[in-house]
Amino acid sequence: MKYLNIKKALTAWQELQPLSEKDKDRLSRRFTVDFNYNSNHIEGNTLTYGQTEILLLFGKVIGEASLRDVQEMTASNVGLRMMTEEAKVKETPLTQNFIRTLHRTLLREDYTVYRNGQYKTRPNSVITRYGDRFEYASPEETPSLMADLVDWYNKAEQEGKLSPVELAALFHFRYIRIHPFEDGNGRIARLMVNFILTRHDYPMIVVRSRKKSEYLEALHQADLEVGPVPSDGAHADIKDIRPFLKYFNNLVATEVYNDVLFVSEKNENVWWYDGERIAFRTPNYTKILNAMRTEPTLTLADMREITGISIAAIQKLLDQLIQKKYVERGEKDGSWRVFMTQ
């Protein structure tokens, strides 16, 4: 079953409300890992999905990881919580100070990042996938363009002519065309998208790093329609960014639909990993996964006793789970870690 449009996905989501506390917690834990992993992975963070889960949910570092990547991921989660709390105060208008504070949180001094929380003082640009250099707003025009962006957002939100999805997509596009900071602009943009959706009681979404090319291509196609002048991009209209809006609508519909499935589907052989629904054809996978989650220190012989599956079959299934990075065995203590959720 697939939703043909975002309206159907949102209707299905609303029909599930109010969620139980258990389902809220399940969604929160899943989103925390998915969002932080993907948003940072897009920008080059090297922590694996499993490392991210253990770090954010249990406060531990497993395997080899750079200090910078660990600190970056931890700060990202602090920023996510800050954004979520701020979005709940719906009567408070958006301010530049909040965006700068969010940036300061993501790129703290212990990362030795230059000018965290302050707008750029030197030009920034990007080399596109097609080899072209694309210039963002100059340092001189950035403060006024950011003032325009925040003023436009608050006015547009009050007027209500744009849907929350249109508002979030257009804010993202305008913000990226300004690129106000010297680093961290993509991560801020993805946080602000969820800030806007949360303010309007929409589920939060994840831009998946495995689909980074689709994300960047949609922005590129919208750039072609708007043109290369930074101030034009910073003041773009919703009709000007049709390629990105189409992408964004599909993204929101897909993410909401997956949330609906995650909450409502009752199938013990269906698991989730980084936004993907994994339906195992045999219940033996579920037997093994549940056994490892219940008792992480199980040996193969223990698994055989609990599941009734032969050791040879268990080893084959484990090899497949490990290859997909759904599970991992600790090098020091030999305990199993399951990175799939239900």
PLM feature segments, named:
Residues 1-183, 187-342:
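FIC/Doc superfamily catalytic core
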